[in-house]
Swiss-Prot record:
One of its GO terms (cellular component) is cytoplasm. Its main location: cytoplasm. CDD domains: AAK_NAGS-ABP (cd04237), NAT_SF (cd04301). Pathway: Amino-acid biosynthesis; L-arginine biosynthesis; N(2)-acetyl-L-ornithine from L-glutamate: step 1/4. Residues 295-442 form the N-acetyltransferase domain. The gene is argA. It is found in: Cytoplasm. InterPro entries: AceGlu_kinase-like_sf, Acyl_CoA_acyltransferase, Asp/Glu/Uridylate_kinase, GNAT_dom, NAGS_kin, NH2A_AcTrfase. GO terms for molecular function: L-glutamate N-acetyltransferase activity. Gene3D superfamilies: 3.40.630.30, Acetylglutamate kinase-like. Disulfide bonds: none annotated. PROSITE patterns: GNAT. This is Amino-acid acetyltransferase.
Length: 442
């Protein structure tokens, strides 16, 4: 008898909102040469095919730094750099063009696979390459001639868009052509950044050896603003890691965000399925550089009632929260503050003011189970306290049966029922016997 796979069913259901959001979006994938020669690249190709199948418009920009270095070393040519940029003379460039051409054909071949009993079965991806990047020479700097090293001058947005409209995957190498008929060796990070910005892509996805940017404890930082990412970049440069994959990709991600790309992701090319988990789960796996946070604390609206009910119902059934009907929520929705993450309400609290006493009750405090070990509760208390201050409230109080110590740790002190506003004393449930705690907020 065939067995049911609940984990597969759960994964499909959880990913559905992201499938809908990403359909028709444009993603630029930036993949360095290290990723191309890693054993997991075959799995990444399968994941790229899946994204294509889901209706996502893809541009893949690849690099060839390690392959170039290896080929030059075999030829007995020592790589020359100036200000972290390769100096590409005639002899070196002839080899680099061969390397990039070979990689382009190899990637195209892998994306063209369609063997039965493989993830690529029936994929039929149309891969298009061309002169989509116009380059110009870097010229001479401090007396050093960069020769065939160049920079991006222009991206053929119309040409790329035309191919994406035909459901083709656009493959771009780090070699650009110029109006004079020459070609130049480019930084793949610069190419990917310019393509993402000029195309007004929805995402730039970078592949690194690490699972995002790591904190001091070795954990991936989930989200960074460009300013925070710049601080980490300075730390990497001070540690002598300015040429590391993480540093190179951080520069591209920061510039992309500031150029208008909403989100740039940094994921590992070593971990199977890292890109899919980053794109189709709420918390992802790597690091995203964002212009605006995927999570925000805000005032609730009538559209949030369903999400609030989903959040508080389990706590009501456990007796932790007092039961509220949908009708009551509709009447009191303007009193609620919520924390929303990618469309899911993960926290809520209500504020009931007693203006005569300059006191307010923070009630219906709830945090989604997946986020209770984070600082979301503190964010919620701070947001509600801030709202209370604006209304002229001097003292915030809570009634709780289970979370006494949690509130004590955050500066709330015990209060007698008799010290509550008179109107609230009349509503006190003596059978429930909730503990009362309060905190001065001004």
């Amino acid at each position: 008898m065939r067995e049911r796979e609940p984990s597969l069913v759960y994964a499909f259901r959880q990913s559905t909102p992201y499938v809908n959001v990403h359909r028709g979006a444009t993603f630029v994938l930036m993949m360095g040469g290290e990723a191309l020669c890693h054993p997991n690249f075959a799995n990444i190709v399968s994941d790229i095919a899946l994204l294509q199948t889901l209706g996502i418009r893809l541009v893949l920009v690849f690099g060839s730094r390690p392959q170039n270095d290896e080929a030059l070393a075999r030829a007995g040519i020592e790589a020359q750099y100036h200000k972290r940029i390769r100096v590409t003379d005639d002899e070196s460039f002839a080899i680099i063009k061969q390397v990039c051409g070979g990689l382009q054909y190899d990637i195209t071949a892998q994306l063209s696979m369609g063997l039965a009993n493989t993830p690529m079965q029936g994929a039929r991806i149309s891969v298009v390459s061309g002169n989509f990047v116009t380059a110009q020479p870097l010229g001479v700097d401090d007396g050093i001639d960069f020769c065939h090293s160049g920079r991006v001058r222009r991206i053929d947005v119309e040409g790329i868009t035309r191919q994406l409209d035909q459901k083709s995957l656009v493959l771009i190498s780090p070699i650009g052509c110029s109006v004079t008929g020459e070609s130049f060796n480019l930084s793949s990070e610069e190419v990917a950044r310019r393509v993402a910005v000029d195309l007004k892509a929805d995402k730039l996805i970078c592949f690194s050896s690490t699972q995002g940017v790591m904190d001091r404890h070795g954990e991936a930082i989930s989200e960074l603003f460009p300013e925070q990412a710049e601080e980490l970049l300075v730390e990497l440069e001070q540690a002598g890691e300015e040429m590391s994959g993480t540093a190179r990709y951080l520069r591209a991600a920061i510039a992309s965000c500031r150029g208008g790309v909403p989100r740039s992701h940094l994921v590992s090319y070593q971990d199977d399925g890292a890109m899919l988990q980053e794109l189709f789960s709420r918390d992802g796996l790597g690091t995203q550089i964002v212009r605006e946070s995927a999570e925000q604390a805000r005032a609730a609206t009538i559209e949030d009632i369903g999400g609030i009910l989903d959040l508080i119902r389990p706590l009501e059934e456990e007796g932790i929260l007092v039961r509220r009907s949908r009708e009551q929520l509709e009447m009191e929705i303007d009193k609620f503050t919520i924390i929303e993450r990618d469309g899911l309400i993960i926290g809520c609290a209500a504020l009931y003011c007693f203006m005569e006493e300059a006191m307010a009750e923070m009630a219906c405090v709830a945090i989604h189970p997946d986020y209770r070990n984070s600082n979301r509760g503190d964010q919620l208390v701070a947001k509600v306290a801030e709202r209370a201050k604006r209304l002229g409230i001097r003292r915030l109080f809570v009634l709780t049966t289970r979370s006494i110590h949690w509130f004590r740790e955050r500066g709330f002190d015990p209060l007698e029922v008799e010290d509550l506003p008179v109107a609230r004393q009349r509503l006190y449930n003596w059978q429930r016997r909730s503990k009362v705690l309060s905190k001065t907020i001004v």
